[in-house]
């Protein structure tokens, strides 16, 4: 039935059977589309599917009087594969909404397709701020984070904590350049100073020459504007060089899942920005324990996986409000009209451009002697209100925003 792409499991929300070949509209059908076998699989993957399942179960398994069902697939980080899956889901399998979607190119294509077919796209793993900017649609909600918040918001937050002088270690390709640009603008806007930057090729194995330039810069903060294995390798080598004895590392895209690979000895003192951490309060801790019980590796949830849970909950509330899932534009309008409230992100709102607003946290990696368990990795340094973390609605050039 699905020869042209790799598919994960098809899940009936509360343990029911496989959906019939007719794919009838006797149920609400949710698709979780993400990387389940590649570089982002640890960060979303099966964890996002688990989060969606938990949300459906916690909501009661039905919306607008119909059972809610989840289907999932691996887009393999290939645009043609991801777009092909989304089109098949919409055209032949009556999927009402697609969630998660790390990989900005696929996310932008699916957002456009969702508008054309009057479906719903809710991005948690997607990063590009274009989803609520020039490429916004009335059928899209961008839930968890974006490049503006991670770059510019983090720069401002660290300067406010006293990190005034910056030097950037940046991956030499479009993503790294954009991340560096956003962070630089945040630093300067907050009154900080950028002393310089050095660019490294994707997949660099030896960072010695780049780290020597960072050490010699005299900066208080070294902003690490790369991702994945590059982040792990560069931060490990920075610790080995002794750079962290006099300078603080700020990982612009270092998430919780990357820290165990680094080890607390190498990562200690590094700062990151995130809208969710499992140890924030009783609600986040309870969710994390339930999540870990289901996860094959017993991992705790990260922000993007938490975002899938929260966004599925709010989507189901909107489906109930509208009385069905068939009219995607009406469902998204209802999502925007209702305040958001869930145990992971608390109370929030969705703006007219589709941007979900919630606080971010400036977090610092704990020292080894401060950690009491495998996932006890971070401590909160500061809280950044959502209206300060995300791009102002007036600056995004979203055509849905009234001038």
Report residues per predicted region.
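Extracytosolic ligand-binding ectodomains
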Residues: 3, 8, 23-403
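Bacterial N-terminal signal peptides
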Residues: 8-18
């Amino acid at each position: 039935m699905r020869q042209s792409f790799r598919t994960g499991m098809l899940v009936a929300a509360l343990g029911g059977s496989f959906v019939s070949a007719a794919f009838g509209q006797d149920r609400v059908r949710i698709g979780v589309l993400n990387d389940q076998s590649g570089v982002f699989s640890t960060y979303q993957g099966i964890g996002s599917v688990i989060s969606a399942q938990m949300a459906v179960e916690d909501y009661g398994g039905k919306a607008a009087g119909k059972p809610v069902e989840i289907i999932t697939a691996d887009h393999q980080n290939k645009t043609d594969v991801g777009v092909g899956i989304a089109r098949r889901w919409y055209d032949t399998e009556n999927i009402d909404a697609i969630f998660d979607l790390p990989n900005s190119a696929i996310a932008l294509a699916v957002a456009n397709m969702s508008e054309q077919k009057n479906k719903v796209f809710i991005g948690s793993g997607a990063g590009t701020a274009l989803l609520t900017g020039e490429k916004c649609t009335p059928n899209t909600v961008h839930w968890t984070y974006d490049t503006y918040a991670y770059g510019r918001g983090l720069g401002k937050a660290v300067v406010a904590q006293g990190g005034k002088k910056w030097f950037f270690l940046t991956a030499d390709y479009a993503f790294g350049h954009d991340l560096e640009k956003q962070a630089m603008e945040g630093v300067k806007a907050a009154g900080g100073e950028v002393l310089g930057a050095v660019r490294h090729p994707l997949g660099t194995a030896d960072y010695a020459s780049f780290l020597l330039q960072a050490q010699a810069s005299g900066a208080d903060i070294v902003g690490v504007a790369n991702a994945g294995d590059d982040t792990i390798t560069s931060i490990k080598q920075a610790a080995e060089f002794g750079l962290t004895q006099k300078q603080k590392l700020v990982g612009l895209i270092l998430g919780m899942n990357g820290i165990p690979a680094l080890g607390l000895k190498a990562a200690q003192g590094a700062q990151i920005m995130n809208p969710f951490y499992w140890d924030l309060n009783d609600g986040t801790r309870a969710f994390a324990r339930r999540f870990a019980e289901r996860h094959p590796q017993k991992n705790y949830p990260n922000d993007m996986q938490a975002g899938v849970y929260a966004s599925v909950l709010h989507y189901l509330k909107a489906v109930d409000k509208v009385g069905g899932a068939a009219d995607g534009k009406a469902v998204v309008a209802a999502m925007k009209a209702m305040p958001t409230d869930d145990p992971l992100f608390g109370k929030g709102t969705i703006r007219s451009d589709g941007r979900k607003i919630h606080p971010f946290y400036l977090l610092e990696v704990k020292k080894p002697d401060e950690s009491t368990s495998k996932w006890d990795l971070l401590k909160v340094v500061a809280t950044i209100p959502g209206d300060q973390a995300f791009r102002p609605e007036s600056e995004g050039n979203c055509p849905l925003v009234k001038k």
